């Protein structure tokens, strides 16, 4: 089975053609500068092709993707008919969606309804969906929501302590993000430890970071909130702050709320603390050279991640497994060690040699650690492909 995975941005579109059963990627690439001029970067194995192709809209971008997939020289399939389904990443499903679903007119209307909750991403995701429908009208399309995995949270975790009408009228609550990644890691960890019923905290640590408290494969709590700004500090996001900080800055510097939120999203986090970079590799190098601001950034990040792990361990009444995933979680042994240094009270013990691993699926705790600590590389595209295949195959029965 071939599933085409689409992640549409406002002026870009990422794609992969994948076998959901094996995880093999036949081809992948990126369309960028949509609406401006258009450029396609297409990869098959180690071979990369870059083409300038006019892309006035997302429809032309999708057409360019399909053309190169069936190209006699650069392609990997003979006909578009060999694509069995399309899986779309959709950022915000609001309270409308608790799982992936086959796209129809009602689903599109519901995604449109969620635009106020995901004003930057949902319109772009819809453009990708409509573009695929236009050029592949007979191919099943599936929406996979970044928020869906977290919809199993209980009210005590997702409700904000603000007047009830804002929840009832405007759906203001904790939603959480990176759900497809958390779902994949939870599923894969269950396979690795050989059981379905256990308690874990997954640390998705990258330029954007979030944690999820998971019991028996279901999310009980997560660190991001109504938006991806909440939780631990990130590459350029502040993470949790006192809401009055916004009022103070806006009043003192005559700044609009929108401009203040842009600052909190794009000019804060590790970039602001270090004054150097949002890239954790740069922070590590700076810390080694004695840059105190880089040291502080790493200490702040590790401290906040550990605080969330401890809080979620309390919420779950203990945990069996702690997992690290995404760019920093998979590759940065220093950050993992700094986080776990705080967790000795839980019986967490890292093996220093095993913790040197980068991007490999493996246990990094000692045999006598009371909590198993794993590195589990995420694969959101595979999760999207598997969800898509499962829904499409079920619909055929």
Name every feature range the model reports, one short phrase each.
Residues 69, 73-121, 142, 149-157:
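Short beta-strand-loop/turn "lid" adjacent to the catalytic site in phosphate-handling enzymes
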Residues 68-83, 189-194, 309-320:
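Phosphate/pyrophosphate-binding loops at sites that engage ATP/ADP/AMP, CoA/4′-phosphopantetheine
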Residues 262, 269-273, 280-315:
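Adenine-nucleotide phosphate-binding core of ATP-dependent small-molecule kinases
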Residues 8-9, 89-91, 205-207, 323-331:
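Glycine-rich beta-strand-to-loop/alpha-helix junction loops that act as flexible
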Residues 215, 220-256, 262, 326-357:
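Catalytic phosphate/nucleotide-handling subdomain of diverse soluble enzymes
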Residues 295, 299-317, 329-397:
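Internal helix-turn-beta structural module
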């Amino acid at each position: 089975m071939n599933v085409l995975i689409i992640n549409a941005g406002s002026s870009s579109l990422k794609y992969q053609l994948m076998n959901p059963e094996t995880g093999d990627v036949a081809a992948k690439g990126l369309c960028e500068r949509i609406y401006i001029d258009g450029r396609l970067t297409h990869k098959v194995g180690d071979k990369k092709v870059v083409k300038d192709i006019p892309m006035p809209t997302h429809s032309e971008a999708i057409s360019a993707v399909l053309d190169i997939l069936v190209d006699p020289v650069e392609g990997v399939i003979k006909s578009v008919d060999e694509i069995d389904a399309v899986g779309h990443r959709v950022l915000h499903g609001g309270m409308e969606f608790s799982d992936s679903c086959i796209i129809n007119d009602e689903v599109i209307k519901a995604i449109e309804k969620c635009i106020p909750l995901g004003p930057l991403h949902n319109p772009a995701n819809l453009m990708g969906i409509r573009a695929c429908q236009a050029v592949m009208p007979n191919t099943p399309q599936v929406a996979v929501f970044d928020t869906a995995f977290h919809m199993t949270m209980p009210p005590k975790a997702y409700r904000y302590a603000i007047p009830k009408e804002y929840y009832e009228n405007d759906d203001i609550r904790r939603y959480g993000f990176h759900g497809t990644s958390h779902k994949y890691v939870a599923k894969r960890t269950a396979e690795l430890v050989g059981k379905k019923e256990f308690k874990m905290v997954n640390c998705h640590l990258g330029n954007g970071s979030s944690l999820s408290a998971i019991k028996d494969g279901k999310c009980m709590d997560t660190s991001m909130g109504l938006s991806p700004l909440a939780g631990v500090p990130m590459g350029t996001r502040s993470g949790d702050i006192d809401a009055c900080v916004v009022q103070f800055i806006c009043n003192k510097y005559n700044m609009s709320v929108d401009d203040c939120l842009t600052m909190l999203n794009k000019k804060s986090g590790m970039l602001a603390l270090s004054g150097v970079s949002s890239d954790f590799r740069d922070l590590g190098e700076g810390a080694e050279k004695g840059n105190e601001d880089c040291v502080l950034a790493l200490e702040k990040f590790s401290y906040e991640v550990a605080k969330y792990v401890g809080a979620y361990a309390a919420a779950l009444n203990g945990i069996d497994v702690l997992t690290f995933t995404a760019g920093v979680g998979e590759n940065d042994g220093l950050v993992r060690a700094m986080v776990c240094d705080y967790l000795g009270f839980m019986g967490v013990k890292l093996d220093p040699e095993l913790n040197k691993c980068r991007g490999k699926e493996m246990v990094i705790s000692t045999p006598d650690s009371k909590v198993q600590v794993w590195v589990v590389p995420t694969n959101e595209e595979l999760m999207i492909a598997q969800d898509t295949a499962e829904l499409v195959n079920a619909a055929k029965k």
